[in-house]
Amino acid sequence: MFWFDKQDPRALFVDIRRETWITDTRPGASPTVVNPDVLADFSNLPFPDNSFPLVIFDPPHLVRNGKQSRMSRKYGDLKGDWREMIRKGFAECFRVLKPEGTLVFKWNELDVSVAEVMALTPERPLVGNRKPATSKTHWLVYLKPNDRGERPERITPGAHEKGNCERSL
């Protein structure tokens, strides 16, 4: 749960669950609240194609936790044919992403390697953290091609200094 402000009007929070429960019984601990703006499955999003300039995809990553475990309740878990579910999730994220839009993908390797998950989409990340030093959480950033299937144009190096922003592929 990495939101700075879940009420930020620039963000649309989507989850398959709407729940509140106590996962930490220590004095002063807050309940876990999952209260999305839109209740939906990430493998079948209720939005038109090319809707968003930025999509953050943070699917469940736990396979071996019990359904009632604190981690599974808080973050969800992978069930059944989870590879197909993640494959469809990637496809849906790219479908609703605008051309030249950005997809940020978050994955923790506790149960499944990031390499195994990356193999579930034909898309390749542009940047990401290859070997997190203190955790197993990876952040990968993808850039959707434009409508012609091309990568976004780049400004020619030095063009901004000349006042001339020629573009090239």
Where are the language model's segments positioned?
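Class I S-adenosyl-L-methionine-dependent methyltransferase catalytic core
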Residues: 1-169
